[in-house]
Amino acid sequence: MNVPTTRKDLMIVNMGPQHPSMHGVLRLIVTLDGEDVIDCEPILGYLHRGMEKIAENRTIIQYLPYVTRWDYLATMFTEAITVNGPEQLGNIQVPKRASYIRVIMLELSRIASHLLWLGPFMADIGAQTPFFYIFRERELIYDLFEAATGMRMMHNFFRIGGVSADLPYGWIDKCFDFCNYFLTRVIEYQKLITRNPIFLERVEGVGIIGREEVINWGLSGPMLRASGIQWDLRKVDNYECYEEFDWEVQWQKEGDSLARYLVRIGEMMESIKIIQQALEGIPGGPYENLEIRSFDREKEPEWNDFEYRFIGKKSSPTFELPKQELYVRVEAPKGELGIFLIGDQNGFPWRWKIRPPGFINLQILPQLVKRMKLADIMTILGSIDIIMGEIDR
């Protein structure tokens, strides 16, 4: 009697670049043995727009609207890094009020980014209800952004030496109201999700990254802090005025998808604490360093004072980058967002190298999904939190 032999043919499956769970135009070539993942190869570049080369052909002022298209869900951070580099190169002082406004906007943007991570992440693993809840709170944040900047997304709010406009009348009270309301909503999320047995079954022990591994791969943000390393650039670098606020770095030691979820939930609570302290202590004074608004008079015809007072539109300020090089970074919602900037005494940067956190965090995905089930790919990919705009640039 012949014993039937089982077939061991491997199946190759393309996930994306249009798959609804791909969080953008990411393509995964997955090799499967039944339900088990044998190999996974990410294919990037579908959203490449040449952002670094564009930067080298624009002044900083002209380039600011472009940077909001990197991570289009946390645009305040891309704006912050774009102005922080020239400010440090040119030794430009930012007024205290402008720094407080920046911190408030950055932390609101962090909450909005984490909310739009939480909803699709829960939808990926089968829970649809939180997906609708998070939009309720996110719209309130966008209402605040719209009142302060004029735009719900792509704000174009940061400027070299400050911000583009002061906070409007009544905005601080509205922001206080949102903070008090949002704390109750986060508690609701925790009741709904954190102890849910089906949720725990899907995320606990899935996609574990060890402490040594996370350092060797160069991961950052919640990916790093979920593996037991208390590293947050807001504490380490003390940029803007974060050292003036009382808050704690959120971290876990398990290193799995559940730990990454808990870190982000904790970060939203800490962001509210920072915002409340900034709103209470925001000083008076100017919202931008007016000395930076310099014009290259030699290239323009002579203007008299009368015309300057009544002219509708002035020419763009020309800021020459000193002949130096600098690496500057901020703690974005997804990790360490940095730029390596080289100036050569010109209005255009000589080199503008972007360090996107999502691109580096994504590199560990093939290792995490090997020997896991096909359904776990969505859980692990969702817990990494990627945006293809900043990965492909």
UniProtKB/Swiss-Prot annotation:
Signal sequence, start to end: none
Main localization, broad class? plastid
* Catalyzed reactions: a plastoquinone + NADH + (n+1) H(+)(in) = a plastoquinol + NAD(+) + n H(+)(out); a plastoquinone + NADPH + (n+1) H(+)(in) = a plastoquinol + NADP(+) + n H(+)(out)
Name the Pfam families on file.
Complex1_49kDa
Top-tier EC class: translocase
Q: Name one GO molecular function term.
A: quinone binding
- Give UniProt keywords alphabetically: Chloroplast, Membrane, NAD, NADP, Plastid, Plastoquinone, Quinone, Thylakoid, Translocase, Transport
Q: What is its EC number?
A: 7.1.1.-
Q: Please give the InterPro entries that the UniProt record associates with this protein.
A: NADH_Q_OxRdtase_suD, NADH_UbQ_OxRdtase_49kDa_CS, NDH1_su_D/H, NiFe-Hase_large
Q: Cross-referenced SUPFAM superfamilies, in alphabetical order?
A: HydB/Nqo4-like
Q: Which GO terms describe its biological process?
A: photosynthesis, light reaction
Gene3D superfamilies under this entry? Cytochrome-c3 Hydrogenase, chain B
Identify one Gene Ontology CC term for this UniProt entry: chloroplast thylakoid membrane
**Similarity-based family:** Belongs to the complex I 49 kDa subunit family.
What does the record note on quaternary structure?
Answer: NDH is composed of at least 16 different subunits, 5 of which are encoded in the nucleus.
The record, for PANTHER family, names:
NADH DEHYDROGENASE [UBIQUINONE] IRON-SULFUR PROTEIN 2, MITOCHONDRIAL (PTHR11993:SF10), NADH-UBIQUINONE OXIDOREDUCTASE 49 KDA SUBUNIT (PTHR11993)
- Name by which UniProt lists this protein: NAD(P)H-quinone oxidoreductase subunit H, chloroplastic
- The gene for this chain is ndhH
